[in-house]
Amino acid sequence: MAVRRDSVWKYCWGVLMVLCRTAISKSIVLEPIYWNSSNSKFLPGQGLVLYPQIGDKLDIICPKVDSKTVGQYEYYKVYMVDKDQADRCTIKKENTPLLNCAKPDQDIKFTIKFQEFSPNLWGLEFQKNKDYYIISTSNGSLEGLDNQEGGVCQTRAMKILMKVGQDASSAGSTRNKDPTRRPELEAGTNGRSSTTSPFVKPNPGSSTDGNSAGHSGNNILGSEVALFAGIASGCIIFIVIIITLVVLLLKYRRRHRKHSPQHTTTLSLSTLATPKRSGNNNGSEPSDIIIPLRTADSVFCPHYEKVSGDYGHPVYIVQEMPPQSPANIYYKV
């Protein structure tokens, strides 16, 4: 029984590990987005539209300023908001910033993991076929870091629309078949990718057309993740059922062992009814003392006196005692 349980456990763990590795290998690390007004990917009136799938990762980076870069450092607080806030470019006091770009000497990065369930209490969770919005109401200066309305969201359309689990072709985009990327660059953007720092000049020989070649088949990623979740749930339910059956079996065996009859030495009724005689009792018969067996004194049945009827007929022990002559006998004449 124990060997069989061990083999079942090993089989379930092996299936879970294989499925986890398969799901991880299918996930995509999206190219990072540099949050700066120099990023030409933020289109006027539209912002940046992405089509991530469940399992993908996305980095939002506030680039640092050093001697090799051009321009000044821009201060931002980046928030995830609802559609109404994104349309009006406003935030609420209870909104928590995803990014606080206030350190010019280092890159500040926030990684978004597109997952339906987060192991972290404060982690982000996403649902398929739902839109999510990221904006910043700061104006780029240190004094306007804590603005709660307007800012670059309104003046430079620095906002991100993330259509999780959706296909770009179904949204009316015919120029890009990659569901995890927004449509191709508009004319006049000089081929600059959204993953390139706005402070670095683009390489004339580089091209972003090859990025979509390695991401074919991502439209079925959602179904594969759903299949993985279903198989994992089935394995967990199967393990719970096995554990429940084992516990019930142990309880049944313990109860059956507890109520099993004790093998005690009993005397027949004929032995109890026949008095025993001894050769040196001087003609007198021995006194037969019948003592009931008090199983309550035994360590095996401490509750015998309460449920003694459950153990069958009472058992008696006969103890022989030598006759005793009376010490003082008085006769009335």
Curated annotation (Swiss-Prot):
Keyword annotations from UniProtKB, A to Z: Angiogenesis, Cell junction, Cell membrane, Developmental protein, Differentiation, Disulfide bond, Glycoprotein, Host cell receptor for virus entry, Host-virus interaction, Membrane, Methylation, Neurogenesis, Phosphoprotein, Receptor, Signal, Transmembrane, Transmembrane helix
Positions on the Cytoplasmic side per record topology: 251-333
Family: Belongs to the ephrin family.
UniProt region (Disordered), positions on chain: 165-213
Reported function: Cell surface transmembrane ligand for Eph receptors, a family of receptor tyrosine kinases which are crucial for migration, repulsion and adhesion during neuronal, vascular and epithelial development. Binds promiscuously Eph receptors residing on adjacent cells, leading to contact-dependent bidirectional signaling into neighboring cells. The signaling pathway downstream of the receptor is referred to as forward signaling while the signaling pathway downstream of the ephrin ligand is referred to as reverse signaling. Binds to receptor tyrosine kinase including EPHA4, EPHA3 and EPHB4.
Compositionally biased residues, Polar residues: 190-213
Tissue: Lung and kidney.
Domain Ephrin RBD: 28-164
Any one GO MF annotation of this record: virus receptor activity
Modified positions (Phosphothreonine) in chain numbering: 274
The protein's name: Ephrin-B2
Membrane topology: Single-pass type I membrane protein
Signal sequence residues: 1-27
Gene name of the encoded protein: EFNB2
Gene3D superfamilies, sorted: Cupredoxins - blue copper proteins
Compartment(s): Cell membrane; Cell junction, Adherens junction
Compositional bias per record (Basic and acidic residues), positions renumbered to this chain: 175-185
Pfam families: Ephrin
UniProt motif (PDZ-binding) ranges: 331-333
GO BP annotation list: adherens junction organization; anatomical structure morphogenesis; animal organ morphogenesis; axon guidance; blood vessel morphogenesis; cell adhesion; cell migration involved in sprouting angiogenesis; cell-cell signaling
CC annotations in GO: adherens junction; dendrite; focal adhesion; glutamatergic synapse; plasma membrane; postsynaptic density membrane; presynaptic membrane; Schaffer collateral - CA1 synapse
SS bond list: 62-101, 89-153
Post-translational modification (record): Inducible phosphorylation of tyrosine residues in the cytoplasmic domain.
Subunit structure: Interacts with PDZRN3. Binds to the receptor tyrosine kinases EPHA4, EPHB4 and EPHA3. (Microbial infection) Interacts with Hendra virus and Nipah virus G protein.
Modified residues (Phosphoserine): 260
UniProt xrefs under SUPFAM superfamilies: Cupredoxins (SSF49503)
Sugar-bearing residue positions: 36, 139
